[in-house]
Regions:
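Helix-turn-helix
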Residues: 21, 29-63, 67-68
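Alpha-helical DNA-contacting segments of helix-turn-helix folds
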Residues: 65-72, 130
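Hydrophobic/aromatic-rich alpha-helical bundle segments in the mid-to-C-terminal region
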Residues: 146-200
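Short, leucine-enriched amphipathic alpha-helices that occur as contiguous helical runs
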Residues: 15, 19-27
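Amphipathic alpha-helical packing segments from all-alpha helical-bundle domains
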Residues: 76-80, 84, 89, 115, ...
Length: 209
């Protein structure tokens, strides 16, 4: 029994390592060849694994790409704070934390930036599903935390968040793909990014009054 348990544990570890190698291969190809390079044979070759594992572990190329997209997305990895953190201010501090964390996360994650751009130019099921999952996560946070606080003005708060989050996406992508200066602020410098962070905090404070 003990030997069987060790064998099963080893098999599980090998499976997870292989899955991670395939995910890493997707990332490497995205960085070198772009989305057009994501072909089954190329992914398997880059990972140094049999292409059958792509089907065994992910159901195929699309399933692997979907898993990679979810692993990179900020909102797919946000846990519901209602289950772990006491919310006593209508979600004001939580809103600040999420916006500031996202501003930092998107800036540092070039792969997520590519996924965000990909979602704007291609009608792909996995990207549509990702957008739907983001909306579901957002709905849980809005309905459970901020809607009760804002009451009749709940939609106004959601509109403010839509502007701030989309602004974060644009500024972070702009900073890493074009000149880093926007409205006279160097978005790659600590000073410039601090100004944006302070602006986000200021706008949340004003929204909550």
């Amino acid at each position: 029994m003990r030997m069987e348990a060790k064998t099963e544990a080893g098999s599980s570890r090998n499976k997870e390592k292989s899955k991670q190698k395939l995910l890493d291969a997707v990332e490497k190809i995205l960085n070198t060849k772009g989305f057009a390079g994501l072909k089954v044979n190329d992914i398997a070759r880059t990972a140094g694994l049999d292409k059958k594992l792509i089907y065994n572990y992910f159901g195929g190329r699309d399933g692997l790409i979907d898993a990679y997209i979810r692993s990179q997305d900020f909102w797919s990895n946000v846990r519901n704070p209602e289950n772990s953190l006491p919310i006593k201010d209508g979600g004001k501090d939580f809103s600040k934390t999420m916006l500031l964390s996202q501003f930092d996360y998107v800036f540092k994650n070039r792969e997520l930036q590519k996924i965000l751009l990909w979602g704007l130019i291609e009608n792909r099921k996995s990207l549509k599903k990702l957008a739907e999952d983001r909306e579901e996560t957002g709905a849980v946070l809005f309905e459970g935390i901020t809607d009760p606080h804002f009451g009749e003005d709940a939609k106004r708060y959601r509109a403010v968040m839509a502007l701030l989050i989309s602004g974060i996406y644009y500024l972070d992508i702009y900073a890493t793909t074009n000149e880093s200066t926007f409205c006279g602020l160097d978005l790659k410098s600590k000073e410039g990014r601090l100004e944006i962070e302070q602006a986000l905090t200021f706008l949340v404070d004003k929204t909550y009054g």
